Amino acid sequence: MEVKLKQLIVILLIIFVSCGNVSAFDYIMELHGKREIIKSYPLSKDKRYLNFILEGTFTDNLGNYGVWDVSSIVTLQNKNVINLQGYGKSTYQNNEFIYVKGIRNKQEQQAGVGKVEVVNASKSLLAIIGMSCTYAVNFYEENAYFIQKCKITEKQKEVLSNISKKKE
């Protein structure tokens, strides 16, 4: 009897844990863009401040696409990122938009991993405010290649899925 009770508890735990993961969906965006340095100042022998913009296009795994732009500032030490912060806007194919805040710390300049959070959105996308994502970026010359992954709720998935269903 005790063995069967332990087996039942293990089975229930597996079901509980599995059901908890069902509500999360991996929302993935691929972004490509061009970097333009606006200002650059030497802060010391090995430190540099940069202000730059990125502009480009994106697609996601829900059939959406659009354009995006970001304005960022970064402090570099020996070509390594000490601190990077930026704000940007992504506009979907139906002209709905989101505003994001991105950060990246202590990594090499040409590649790294950071976080993005949706801080504002147009009316039909309000449900995704607060969505947090991890991104990876690589640069080749002034070209940026991003992949961004977010764990989203079913409600957020529904909202984002509806973008591709609306007429442009």
Question: Language-model segments: which ranges?
Answer:
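Beta-strand-enriched cores of mature, soluble protein domains
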Residues: 24-168
